[in-house]
Structure formats: C-alpha cells, structure tokens
Amino acid sequence: MELEFLGTCSGQPSKLRNVSSLALKLLDELNEIWLFDCGEATQHQILRTNIRLRKITKIFISHNHGDHIFGLPGLLSTRSFQGDVGPLTIYGPAGIEQFVKTSLRISKTKISYPIKFVTLEEGGKIVSERGFEVYTEKLDHRIDSWGFRMVEADKAGELLMDKLAEFKVPNGPLLGKLKRGEQVELADGTVLNGKDFLGPAKKGRVVTVIYDTRSTPSIRRLADHADVLVHEATFDASEGKLARDYYHSTCTQAAETASACHVGHLYLTHVSARYVGSLASQMVKQAREIFPATTLAKDLDKFVVPMKG
C-alpha cells in the first residue's frame, strides 16, 4: 500500500505544484489503484510515474470545484486507448456524472469501458469488497464536499510453524486450512484447530483523505486512529480568519486534528502557491509544534503505508 501525490496545490497550478490528485496504490493487495480527486493535468503527472491508467478502478471526487475535477475528461478518454482496461467507478457529489457525460458528449469522445457513477448523498459506507471498506462524511465547504476513510480488514496472524512441527502436518491443503484458522483432521485421527496455531492478528491499515473544508466534527470521525491522514492545509497558522472565510483549513488545524485523533502520520496537501521556500518551512514548523509526525507533501512524493506490528 503506497500513496503517491500527483498534485498538491490549491486553486490553480504553480510552477512547483499541480492541482489536487492523490493515488492510493493497492497493487500488492488488489492489483488496483484508487484515485482521490483529479484536477487539471493529472494525466500529465501520471506520465511522470509508473502508474498505468488501466490499474485505476475507482476515482473518489471530494467536490466539484474545477481544481479537483477538470482532469477527469482527459484521463477517462486516454484510459480508453489502453485496450481492455475494465470498468471504472466514480464516487462523487451530485453533478459529477453530468459534468463527465456532458464533457464527453460535447467533445464527441467515446469511452470503450463502462463507467459507473455513485452519487454521494449521505455519510456512511460506500465501498465494501475484497477486504477493503471506504466510508464518507460531508465536510464544511462552500459547496458539498466529502471526506473519505479507507479501512483495510485485519490480517490473520502468521502460522506458528514451530508450534505445529510436532504434528508433522504435510505441505498442501491441510496447512492452507490451518492458516485460515479452520479445523483439520490428520491421518492418525488427531484434530487440530487452526486458531490454536496462529499468531496475533495484524490490524488493517486506515487512510483518511480530507480535501477542501473548514474544521468540522466529521473530520475527526473519519480520521480517528488513522495510520495516515492526508489533510488540506491551504493556509498557515497566521491566516485562520482567511481560512474560515474561504472555507479552508490551516496547517495547525490539520495538526490539531491529527493529534486529537491519534493518527500515525499527517501529510499536508492542497497548499496555497504562496508557501514556497522559507514560508513552506515555516508552515511545517508550525504544524510539527502540535503534531511532530507531519510532512508537507510535494508533487510526486511517494509514501509507503506500513503494516502495524
């Protein structure tokens, strides 16, 4: 499981940062990549990575402002040129289906694969498949904006081969059943319960993505004990009033959330283009005074989400 930041700037692209997009790479787990937002030129950023468009199976859209969706038509069109790419699902606010279909219709773009749209209307579980769940809640922005919490199912503990050695279980189906915690009967009639030979279960990982919003209680519900919190930080600590007036967050508000929610690591994104050089360093310093495990993400940064334990 790996995060790759494709765009980390707010509002409009700068020379150093493109607008919002984040790839959650689940290649080892599902052989899939999930995208969170798709601002202008996201597919250009992807050309600078090892991401293949055919691997993108889900796109989660936080809200319908242009810096978060203008890259969709081009990316969807280019994905059609990749051959048999399989279906894709887009989760987003009311209006995202109309935006995509209108853009494709007016440009006479034909898509070679099915696209399913899931309109976000209320908070709750929106994905449950193959050991992963995604939850969403509404945030506090000028238009409907949604945050996302991805939860990986717990992993079974490792088979304790030393403990099992005395029973001389042969390689094959019986070992597989024991690894799954099932009961088996050996050739001599001995009955073994797989649960007796498994180490402690490994907690699944949690990744929370929060784009445009003011501080609001739903963020903390989504971020509770997340391994990784990706949180917008449009402004630094000195611009609290500006952040509130424009329905955005400061770096210290993101850090306060990370601290209160006991997250593993905080990645700041959606940063105003004004924060470069010493101003960017100052922003990180402000956040780290509250939550030391903070990183100001840059375009094309990659971060592995480690397993617990």
From Swiss-Prot:
Cofactor note as given: Binds 2 Zn(2+) ions.
CDD domains, alphabetized: RNaseZ_ZiPD-like_MBL-fold
Binding locations of Zn(2+) 2: D67, H68, D212, H270
Catalytic residues of the enzyme: D67 (proton acceptor)
Protein family according to the UniProt entry: Belongs to the RNase Z family.
Protein function: Zinc phosphodiesterase, which displays some tRNA 3'-processing endonuclease activity. Probably involved in tRNA maturation, by removing a 3'-trailer from precursor tRNA.
Binding site for Zn(2+) 1: H63, H65, H141, D212
Top EC group: hydrolase
Subunit structure as annotated in this protein's UniProt entry: Homodimer.
Name by which UniProt lists this protein: Ribonuclease Z
Keyword Acetylation part of the UniProt annotation: no
Reactions listed under catalytic activity: Endonucleolytic cleavage of RNA, removing extra 3' nucleotides from tRNA precursor, generating 3' termini of tRNAs. A 3'-hydroxy group is left at the tRNA terminus and a 5'-phosphoryl group is left at the trailer molecule
UniProt cross-references to Pfam families, sorted A to Z: Lactamase_B (PF00753)
EC number(s) reported in the record: 3.1.26.11
Source species, domain of life: Bacteria
Database matches in InterPro entries: Metallo-B-lactamas, RibonucZ/Hydroxyglut_hydro, RNase_Z/BN
MF GO annotations: 3'-tRNA processing endoribonuclease activity; zinc ion binding
Cofactor list: Zn(2+)
Entry keywords, A to Z: Endonuclease, Hydrolase, Metal-binding, Nuclease, tRNA processing, Zinc
